[in-house]
């Protein structure tokens, strides 16, 4: 038995989960927030308890030190060296990293070079790796990429219809995201259906504040909705998803809101989607509450959101030449039963149908009617477990 920790480092946060492997038992989990700011918050959850402390944490190295000391303080481990492996989520692996990789040689430098593709994420992910390397230099460190699962896409799916030089010189292509989640729920869907993953065609829908949909054939991603960045694809909580690119130069010319690249990124990534259309909230719970009060903008935002998701699911029926199941996961996908019902009701002619008695909050598994030809599944995602499994697989 070994202890492995899965890490998701953000620019000012550190989310973690400690596993006993190979049993895959969660021993503890936690979150450190406001790194680099005053009144940082460290939360540790274990054995049904939740312990929190407020202190000033200057950087990721100090955050990792506090995390490790808390594990000892709460008697979860006796010493640092009980942890034999650490896995780090990294958003962008580009074309270079096609699978999870042990951190050695120039791996970390390559991760930092790929910050051009994920400037908000990769630098923070790399900071988390460096912090653990400093404090636990002798254990196996593994980087697990959101994009790796999508490197199986054929060229016709990942290339954009731009002049070739922008691909060869600037690496402009579809990379996708949420790959670890799509990979996990595809595997769980095969177990639930009692069929080999290699025999299945699945449409996996990771729908949270950010969202993406993936066509999975024989366990491999063959197309996905997010593109060069996580801005592409379906409408999301605060992101536009796909729009006509000509809108950008038009608004640059005729408004004061699009003067710089930073302005463009802010509006498209943080001020659009459900939030932008509803002028209310990016949270599906707030949107549904406003819809119930006959709020027109919220109703329109909800209808647009469902519409874009239905269109992408339909598109992937064409890509896969049919599907065996549609899988919902992540915050909205797992918890918003009205949303699932409305998405499926609009594409029921494919042969999918939701049983209202099964489609309730908190229920997971197969929510289809008995007569449905295509199964509709709700499967909680577990990206941290995928990371822990990859660490175990790659340990020396």
From Swiss-Prot:
<feature type="binding site">
    <location>
        <position position="15"/>
    </location>
    <ligand>
        <name>ATP</name>
    </ligand>
</feature>
<dbReference type="GO" id="GO:0000287">
    <property type="term" value="F:magnesium ion binding"/>
</dbReference>
<feature type="site" description="Transition state stabilizer">
    <location>
        <position position="178"/>
    </location>
</feature>
<keyword id="KW-0963">Cytoplasm</keyword>
<dbReference type="InterPro" id="IPR043129">
    <property type="entry name" value="ATPase_NBD"/>
</dbReference>
<feature type="site" description="Transition state stabilizer">
    <location>
        <position position="239"/>
    </location>
</feature>
<dbReference type="InterPro" id="IPR004372">
    <property type="entry name" value="Ac/propionate_kinase"/>
</dbReference>
<feature type="binding site">
    <location>
        <begin position="283"/>
        <end position="285"/>
    </location>
    <ligand>
        <name>ATP</name>
    </ligand>
</feature>
<comment type="similarity">
    <text>Belongs to the acetokinase family.</text>
</comment>
<comment type="pathway">
    <text>Metabolic intermediate biosynthesis; acetyl-CoA biosynthesis; acetyl-CoA from acetate: step 1/2.</text>
</comment>
<dbReference type="Pfam" id="PF00871">
    <property type="entry name" value="Acetate_kinase"/>
</dbReference>
<feature type="binding site">
    <location>
        <begin position="331"/>
        <end position="335"/>
    </location>
    <ligand>
        <name>ATP</name>
    </ligand>
</feature>
<protein>
    <recommendedName>
        <fullName>Acetate kinase</fullName>
        <ecNumber>2.7.2.1</ecNumber>
    </recommendedName>
</protein>
<feature type="binding site">
    <location>
        <position position="383"/>
    </location>
    <ligand>
        <name>Mg(2+)</name>
    </ligand>
</feature>
<feature type="active site" description="Proton donor/acceptor">
    <location>
        <position position="146"/>
    </location>
</feature>
<comment type="subunit">
    <text>Homodimer.</text>
</comment>
<dbReference type="GO" id="GO:0006083">
    <property type="term" value="P:acetate metabolic process"/>
</dbReference>
<dbReference type="GO" id="GO:0005524">
    <property type="term" value="F:ATP binding"/>
</dbReference>
<feature type="binding site">
    <location>
        <position position="89"/>
    </location>
    <ligand>
        <name>substrate</name>
    </ligand>
</feature>
<keyword id="KW-0418">Kinase</keyword>
<comment type="function">
    <text>Catalyzes the formation of acetyl phosphate from acetate and ATP. Can also catalyze the reverse reaction.</text>
</comment>
<dbReference type="GO" id="GO:0006085">
    <property type="term" value="P:acetyl-CoA biosynthetic process"/>
</dbReference>
<feature type="binding site">
    <location>
        <begin position="206"/>
        <end position="210"/>
    </location>
    <ligand>
        <name>ATP</name>
    </ligand>
</feature>
<keyword id="KW-0808">Transferase</keyword>
<keyword id="KW-0547">Nucleotide-binding</keyword>
<keyword id="KW-0460">Magnesium</keyword>
<dbReference type="GO" id="GO:0008776">
    <property type="term" value="F:acetate kinase activity"/>
</dbReference>
<feature type="binding site">
    <location>
        <position position="8"/>
    </location>
    <ligand>
        <name>Mg(2+)</name>
    </ligand>
</feature>
<keyword id="KW-0479">Metal-binding</keyword>
<keyword id="KW-0067">ATP-binding</keyword>
<dbReference type="InterPro" id="IPR000890">
    <property type="entry name" value="Aliphatic_acid_kin_short-chain"/>
</dbReference>
<dbReference type="GO" id="GO:0005737">
    <property type="term" value="C:cytoplasm"/>
</dbReference>
<dbReference type="InterPro" id="IPR023865">
    <property type="entry name" value="Aliphatic_acid_kinase_CS"/>
</dbReference>
């Amino acid at each position: 038995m070994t202890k492995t920790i899965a890490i998701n480092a953000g620019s000012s946060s550190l989310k973690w989960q400690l596993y006993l492997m190979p049993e895959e038992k969660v021993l503890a989990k936690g979150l450190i927030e406001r790194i680099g700011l005053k009144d940082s918050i460290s939360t540790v959850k274990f054995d049904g308890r939740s312990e929190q402390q407020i202190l000033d944490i200057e950087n990721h190295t100090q955050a990792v030190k506090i995390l490790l000391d808390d594990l000892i303080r709460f008697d979860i481990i006796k010493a640092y060296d009980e942890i034999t492996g650490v896995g780090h989520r990294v958003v962008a692996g580009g074309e270079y990293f096609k699978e999870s990789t042990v951190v050695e040689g120039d791996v970390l430098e390559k991760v930092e070079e790929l910050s051009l593709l994920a400037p908000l994420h990769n630098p923070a992910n790399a900071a988390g790796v460096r912090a653990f390397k400093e404090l636990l230099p002798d254990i196996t460190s593994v980087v697990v990429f959101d994009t790796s699962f999508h490197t199986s896409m054929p060229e016709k799916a990942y290339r954009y219809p731009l002049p070739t030089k922008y691909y060869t010189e600037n690496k402009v292509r579809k990379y996708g995201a949420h790959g670890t989640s799509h990979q996990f729920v595809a595997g769980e869907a095969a177990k639930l259906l009692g069929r080999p993953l290699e025999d299945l065609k699945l449409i996996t829908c990771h729908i949270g504040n950010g969202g993406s949909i993936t066509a999975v054939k024989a366990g491999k991603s063959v197309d996905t909705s997010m593109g060069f960045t996580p801005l592409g694809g379906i409408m999301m909580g605060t992101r536009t998803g796909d729009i006509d690119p000509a809108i950008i130069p038009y608004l640059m010319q005729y408004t004061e809101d699009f003067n710089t690249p930073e302005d463009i990124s802010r509006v498209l990534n943080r001020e659009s989607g459900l939030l932008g259309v509803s002028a209310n909230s990016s949270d599906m719970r707030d949107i549904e509450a406003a819809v119930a009060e006959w709020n027109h903008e919220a109703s329109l935002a909800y209808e647009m959101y469902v519409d874009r998701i239905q269109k992408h699911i339909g598109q992937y029926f064409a890509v896969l030449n049919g599907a065996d199941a549609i899988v919902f996961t992540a915050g909205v996908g797992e918890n918003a039963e009205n949303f699932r019902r409305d998405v499926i009701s609009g594409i029921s002619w494919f042969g999918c149908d939701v049983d209202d008695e099964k489609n309730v909050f908190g229920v997971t598994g197969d929510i289809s009617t008995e007569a449905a030809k295509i199964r509709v599944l709700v499967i909680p995602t577990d990206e941290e477990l995928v990371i822990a499994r990859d660490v175990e697989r790659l340990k020396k």
